[in-house]
Amino acid sequence: MLRKDSPRGILKIGATGLRARFTLDGKEIGFTNMPYTDMEFETGALKAGRHVLAAAVDNNFDKLSSTFGMGDRMKIFLPYYDFYGFGGFYRGVSLHQVFESTIDRVQVRTLCIKTGKVALRFLFSGKTEGKHAVRFRFNTEEAFRTAEVAHGETLECTVPEFRLWTPEAPNLHTLEVHTENDCVVERFGIRTVSTGGKQILLNGKPVYLKGFNRHESHPEFGAATPDALMLEDLQNLRDLNCNFVRGCHYAQDQRFLDLCDEFGMLVWDESLGWGNSAEQMADPEFQEIVERETRLMVRDSINHPCVIIWAYLNENNSQTEPGFRMGERVVKAVKEEDPTRLVTFACNHTLDDITSKLMDIISYNIYPGWIGSHPVGVEPPDEIPPFQEKTIEYFRKNVSADKPMIVSEMGCCGIYGQHDIAATQWTEEFQAE
């Protein structure tokens, strides 16, 4: 029930799986085929009173979905992916009544960690033409600053009494922005991330990343993870003295990133993909979806200081020309959206990759002693050092002798509760060894 008229409405979808079509009072207002991606749809003018908002959500992979108006085969989430394609809503759904011109958000970028100088990029929606009068202030400032800005325009200013964001001291600041009829509050941290030779630098100082990969998946809740479970995961990481988590293999929930901001947990955020073939990456529709979902991920999470790495398409066929061209396209798109962070992807073609040379960081997935053939008479743990040495040698010789490296995946899987005194594969004993 809407209590008043409004010239516009915006339907905000946190994330769905795998496709969804939305109607308002029988009229279609939006469609998404990008799982785990936050989406927004304009509804047009809204009258006071009752309305029927309907959603058809489908996690079929094949053409059966076209019967229900869901398009052709699912392009970006395929049956062979090694995690389940849950159906339904993963995150929040909300309908907002807004004015003809609204402030969508303000992107905050650190310019100088010594002075607290930041760049504010103002983004409006609806009628965005011309200048917009804004009032803004940082943290608990009493007085507002004023300016007239156009859509996409950037202002530079200094945050008073600023403190840097670091894993040890995750200091956060707020920016409150008002227009004539709208208001947004952005939370951000002042910090920089860069590389210096083989090192990753946070605020100009080397940082050594120690952490785990993490999925949004639970036997009871699926991909709709409650806040308490997110918090428990971060507590466990903290107890293990970790400072880094890789969100795999899709854009992360904003609630989780909020917690990481507060915990001081550094984050690798990547767009959806897993083992994608050269044929897929040569498909123009697939390329368009990958670029769009990656751009949306960056826009959604750009103000989170915890995010230091953007990534895409886990374990794609990076040894092929389509893989290289896909990498070129994604890196270009990410740098257009956000030139301040590092870009990578998790590579499993560790002896023939040609795409990692485009990245800021070389990242690789290896499973010596678990996946693949095993030398006779060699214990699985003993396979790790020579495999590591061979991988590093290839990348240093063929990609870069002077880029940071991340072991993005390594180890082996175990099935909870499966035991064997002989420590056979998939047992907890084999995994622990």
Feature locations, PLM:
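Short strand-turn-strand beta-turns centered on an Asx-Gly dipeptide
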Residues: 23-29, 139-140, 180-181, 203
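N-terminal carbohydrate-binding accessory modules
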Residues: 106-110, 164, 176-239, 258, ...
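Substrate-binding/catalytic cleft of secreted carbohydrate-active enzymes
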Residues: 234-237, 244-433
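Accessory beta-strand-rich segments of carbohydrate-active enzymes
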Residues: 1-102, 128, 251, 265-268
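Surface beta-strand/loop "capping" patches
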Residues: 97-128
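A short, polar/charged loop-to-alpha-helix boundary motif
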Residues: 35-46, 196, 218-225, 275
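Extended acidic/polar, glycine-enriched regions
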Residues: 46-50, 121-196
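Short hydrophobic alpha-helix segments
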Residues: 30-33, 146, 186, 210
